[in-house]
Swiss-Prot record:
<dbReference type="Pfam" id="PF04193">
    <property type="entry name" value="PQ-loop"/>
</dbReference>
<protein>
    <recommendedName>
        <fullName>Uncharacterized protein UU041</fullName>
    </recommendedName>
</protein>
<feature type="transmembrane region" description="Helical">
    <location>
        <begin position="73"/>
        <end position="93"/>
    </location>
</feature>
<feature type="transmembrane region" description="Helical">
    <location>
        <begin position="4"/>
        <end position="24"/>
    </location>
</feature>
<feature type="transmembrane region" description="Helical">
    <location>
        <begin position="44"/>
        <end position="64"/>
    </location>
</feature>
<keyword id="KW-0472">Membrane</keyword>
<keyword id="KW-0812">Transmembrane</keyword>
<dbReference type="GO" id="GO:0005886">
    <property type="term" value="C:plasma membrane"/>
</dbReference>
<keyword id="KW-1133">Transmembrane helix</keyword>
<keyword id="KW-1003">Cell membrane</keyword>
<comment type="similarity">
    <text>To U.parvum UU007, UU008 and UU042.</text>
</comment>
<dbReference type="InterPro" id="IPR006603">
    <property type="entry name" value="PQ-loop_rpt"/>
</dbReference>
Length: 120
C-alpha cells in the first residue's frame, strides 16, 4: 500500500472519530435533560437522511471498488452509522416532546418548562 491511500485512510478515521465525539455530548445532554426545544426538527430529519445515504454510498463504494473501497469507505460507513443512531435518539426525544406539547396545546419550550423540568 503506498503512502497516499494510508494518508486518506488516516484522514477518514480521524474525521470519523471527531464526528462521533462531537455528537456524543449533545445526545448525553438530551437524554439527561430531555430538552429538545433548541434543536430543529428539520435538522434532525436532514441529518438522519444524510447519514443513511452516506452509509448506503459507502457500502456501495466498498462493494464496487474492491481495490481501495473498503479502507477508504469503512470510516465513513461506521461514523455515519453511529451518528445516525445518535441522531435517531435525539429525533425520538424531539418527536415525543412535540407530541406531548401538542396534547397540552403548548409549544415545546413551554411544555418542557411546565411539566418536564420540575420532574428531573
Amino acid at each position: 500500500m503506498s503512502s497516499l491511500p494510508v494518508i486518506i485512510l488516516v484522514i477518514g478515521i480521524f474525521g470519523s472519530i471527531f464526528l462521533v465525539i462531537g455528537y456524543i455530548p449533545q445526545v448525553i445532554k438530551v437524554i439527561k435533560t430531555k430538552r429538545t426545544d433548541g434543536i430543529s426538527l428539520t435538522f434532525l430529519i436532514s441529518l438522519n437522511i444524510a447519514c443513511f445515504l452516506f452509509v448506503i454510498y459507502s457500502i456501495l463504494v466498498m462493494i464496487f471498488n474492491k481495490h481501495n473501497g473498503i479502507p477508504t469507505a469503512l470510516p465513513l460507513c461506521l461514523a455515519n452509522t453511529i451518528v445516525g443512531i445518535l441522531g435517531l435518539v435525539i429525533l425520538i426525544y424531539k418527536v415525543k416532546n412535540i407530541k406531548k406539547a401538542k396534547l397540552y396545546l403548548m409549544d415545546e419550550k413551554t411544555y418542557y418548562e411546565k411539566y418536564v423540568l420540575n420532574n428531573l
